[in-house]
Amino acid sequence: MNAVAKTVPHTDYKIADISLADWGRKELDIAEHEMPGLMSIRRKHAQTKPLKDVRITGSLHMTIQTAVLIETLKDIGANVRWASCNIFSTQDHAAAAIAATGTPVFAWKGETLEEYWDCTLDALTFTLPDGTLTGPELVVDDGGDVTLLIHKGYELENGSTWVDEPASSHEEGVIKALLKRVAVERPGYWARVVKDWKGVSEETTTGVHRLYQIAEAGKLLIPAINVNDSVTKSKFDNLYGCRESLADGLKRAMDVMLAGKVAVVCGYGDVGKGSAASLRAYGARVIVTEIDPICALQASMEGFEVNTIESTLGRGDIYVTTTGNKDIITVEHLQAMKDQAIVCNIGHFDNEIQVDALNALKGVEKINIKPQVDKYVFGNGNAIFLLADGRLVNLGCATGHPSFVMSNSFANQTLAQIDLWEKRDSYEKKVYILPKHLDEEVARLHLEKIGVKLTTLTKDQADYLGVDVAGPYKPDHYRY
C-alpha cells in the first residue's frame, strides 16, 4: 500500500489532528506486514465482499492495529463508523489515517467521559438516504459499551426507570444523562436501532461477562459471538500480548528499573499470567493474589509467591490489577503502601482501583507528573504513583499489544462479523463461540510469518485419534 494517506474530503469525524494522517499511514503499512492472518482474510474476501453495505459500528481501541482491522472490514464491503473503547487508548495518528480515507471516526487520546460517550453515540448513528437516523446492523465491541448503551436505551423506551435511579459512579451518571438527552432529541431512536441490529462480536473478558449476564437475565436483544474465548484470542492476546505490553507501559510511564523490585500482580487468569511473566522476565520478584484455588495453584507451581494483598503492603514496589473485578485495590490499601509505590491496572475497566474514592479523600495532594502519570501525596508524607487514572496502563501509557498478536484477535473479529451476517436469520439471541476449525485456521494463518512448519498426520494416525487429517485436532472441551 502507498505510505501516503489518500485524503477524502469529509467532516464526519472528531479526532485530534487530521495532519497526522501521513504518519499514521506509514505505521499502518508496517503493521500490515506484521498482521498476516488479518491480511490473508482481507485478500480472501476482497472480491466476494461478504459484508457488502453492512453498517458496522466499532467500539475498540483506536490504535494502528485497529486501523488495519477497520480497513479490512471496509475492503470486504462494510460501511464502518468507529470510536475508541477507552478515553486514553487512541493513537491520534491512527485515527487521523482512518479519518483521512473517509471513514467516520470519533476518538482522540485524553477524552473526558462526557466526550467519550458522545463519541460512542456518534459512532453508532447512521443516516439513511431519506435522512432518518438509525444504527448499525453489526457491532464490534470491546468491553460492551455499545451493547450496554443500546440495551439501556431500548429499555428506557420500554418503560425502564434506571436512568432516574442514583448513579453509582460518575461514569454511570454520564451514561444516564446521555440517554435522557437522546430520549428528548430522538424519540423512538433505540427501537429503530434494535430493529436492524443483527449481532455483536465481543473482544474482551469483561465485555463477555456483561453479555452472559444480559443473556442469563433473558434480556439479550441479538445473537452475540464471544471472540475473547477463542483460543487464538485469549491464549495469545491476553497472555502473550500482556507479557510484552505491560512492561512497555511501566517503562514509558516511569522509566523505572524493574529488576529487584517487588511486584504484586492481582489475579492470575490469562492477563495475570502474562503480566506476571512480563515482570519476572525483567527480574522483578513477583507476588500473585488470587481468589481461585486452581489459578492460585498454577501460580505457585510457576514459582510465584501467592498471598493476600494485605500481606504485601509496605513491601510491594509495583501493583498491577488484572482481574476484571471491582475494588481490588482500596483507598485503605493505597494509604498503607510503601512510599513511592507504582499502581496500575491492565484490566478493561477503571474500577479495579478505587480511583474516585482516592480523588475524594481529604488531605491528599494530587500532582500531575505528565499525561497519565499522577503522584498522590498522603498526609504522612508517603506517596504513590497512579498510572493512566487506573485505566489500561499498556494503552494509556504505551501503544498496547504488538501487531502480530493483535492479528490473531482481529482475524477472529473479522470472521465473527462475517459469521454473524451470514447466519443472521438462523442464530438465536444467545452467546456463541466461533467453531474450532476457524480457531485452528486463524493460528495456521500466522505460522509462515514466524517460520513454523507443521507435522502432518497420516490417515492411519488420524483414524487412531478419531480426527480428520486436516483437523480440528482437539475436542471443544480441551483446555489449551
From Swiss-Prot:
NAD(+) binds at residues 204-206, 238, 267-272, 290, 325, 346-348, 394. One of its GO terms (molecular function) is adenosylhomocysteinase activity. The keyword Calcium does not apply. Pathway: Amino-acid biosynthesis; L-homocysteine biosynthesis; L-homocysteine from S-adenosyl-L-homocysteine: step 1/1. Keywords: Cytoplasm, Hydrolase, NAD, One-carbon metabolism. It comes from the Bacteria. Its EC number is 3.13.2.1. Substrate binds at T63, D142, E203, K233, D237. This is Adenosylhomocysteinase. It comes from Xanthomonas campestris pv. campestris (strain ATCC 33913 / DSM 3586 / NCPPB 528 / LMG 568 / P 25). The lineage of its organism: Bacteria, Pseudomonadati, Pseudomonadota, Gammaproteobacteria, Lysobacterales.
